[in-house]
Curated annotation (Swiss-Prot):
The keyword ATP-binding applies. CTPSs have evolved a hybrid strategy for distinguishing between UTP and CTP. The overlapping regions of the product feedback inhibitory and substrate sites recognize a common feature in both compounds, the triphosphate moiety. To differentiate isosteric substrate and product pyrimidine rings, an additional pocket far from the expected kinase/ligase catalytic site, specifically recognizes the cytosine and ribose portions of the product inhibitor. This is CTP synthase. It comes from Marinobacter nauticus (strain ATCC 700491 / DSM 11845 / VT8). Its EC number is 6.3.4.2. Gene3D superfamilies: 3.40.50.880, P-loop containing nucleotide triphosphate hydrolases. UTP binds at residues 13, 186-191, 222. The active site is at residues 378, 514, 516. ATP binds at residues 14-19, 71. The lineage of its organism: Bacteria, Pseudomonadati, Pseudomonadota, Gammaproteobacteria, Pseudomonadales. InterPro entries: Class_I_gatase-like, CTP_synthase, CTP_synthase_N, GATASE, GATase1_CTP_Synthase, P-loop_NTPase.
Amino acid sequence: MTRYIFVTGGVVSSLGKGIASASLAAILEARGLKVTILKLDPYINVDPGTMSPFQHGEVFVTEDGAETDLDLGHYERFIRTPMTKRNNFTTGRVYEEVIRKERRGDYLGGTVQVIPHITDEIKRRVVEGAAGADVALIEVGGTVGDIESLPFLEACRQLKVEVGSQRALFMHLTLVPYIATAGEIKTKPTQHSVKEMRSIGLQPDILLCRSEHEVDASSRRKIALFTNVEERAVIPMQDARSIYAIPRMLHEYGLDQLVIERFGLDAREADLSEWDAVVDSLMNPQDEVTIAMVGKYMELLDAYKSLIESLLHAGIKTRTKVNINYIDSEDIERDGTSVLESADAILVPGGFGERGVEGKIRTVQYARENKVPYLGICLGMQVAVIEYARNVAGLKDAHSTEFREHTPEPVVGLITEWLDATGEKEERTEESDLGGTMRLGAQDCVLTEGSTIVGCYGKKTIRERHRHRYEVNNHFLPRLEEAGLQISGRSADGKLVEVVEAPDHPWFVACQFHPEFTSTPRDGHPLFKGFVEAALANKKGS
């Protein structure tokens, strides 16, 4: 039988519920338990797929092609269980399903209400997503007290009543601020946050106390007294050197043992040696490199969360400190490429829309002509093709129809037909909705023998995740290949270009897929590892 841990947040948002949930899950997994994590998002969008990166940050793509919250990226980086479309749902998704049932007549003419219909649908999805796990952590987005979260919290309350307190508990993450002028931490915000929980019928069983400073024993006793939480269940969670040090921190405070005892589970001792090795490598690098990342969402780095972590993971695997220089592509358009001169390697990530595209194209040209290691991802591959077409193949008007609908030389165009993650044929037109209409999820890719990328992976057939609706136009491939561009990866059916490489260059790889979605701190990723190694070689050779 599955046990449920409902994770809520109080006082302020962005305290790190996702990291806390993932860290506890990692410890429980290290004790031999099968775990999973769900994220319940209270916004009315059906999914984050059409939301601006400035609003929401990264859209994380799962193996089965779901566009989900970036917290699912944290979950996959901390535990071995792959996330699916069942691990994340929103208010919009819930209401969409309930309204569909009402239109179909499933409610037999009854009045459709938040309770029981919306809460029942939430409970159904939680139980479905948690099926098969020994322990499921359910992270409720937002902050206790927000009107948007109320249906989710009520559904969690009901589910705990239904399964019993031996199979469910509430873990509340709250802020314990340090007031510098007073020289002490303050517990009052936590007390008020728990009071807010009680007002809707919820009593936390565990409190995680986020603070810049250690929450001392006397403060924990005070919190326990005024919140009706067992003292040993008031767990400090102060700022750490790295998020990957948090599993060890929480384990030393006894959080996992508390959960094991509460649920009556039989579990072995936690083996956190892999996490200790990750932190040791991260904190004791033997070299360092500087990567220039040229994108258009630099005002909110969460838009590139998985990518930033992937470079960090590559540094862990190579014992290299990876310094990232974040550069807005519009700055390249305005001021030129001199800002790239200090970089040991250059990366252009994915993105949407015309703004900043010419700056990315100029970045590619700089990397190609100056033999600087280059990694292009998604749009980063498309601009690499455009740059090569213009400056090497002689297609001076080369562009993408995403940015120039009537360009005379559309070297990148809309995909109209492809196979999805399950092998089913998908078709799209210019009139299709934006939401959920991209080529999404894991796809097989066949690499070319002798290419740089096959040297990274060490095998010819790989499987990586996609999120795009534009592709290289096959009509122009003969002209591009004649000019020297190497097509070093194609889709399994051979119809879509997945990887290109530039000739006579030490390391120039551009891929249509998103390798950052499968990188983890314990395993790294072969493409990012190869990229950082190329940056090291360039640094030492310069």
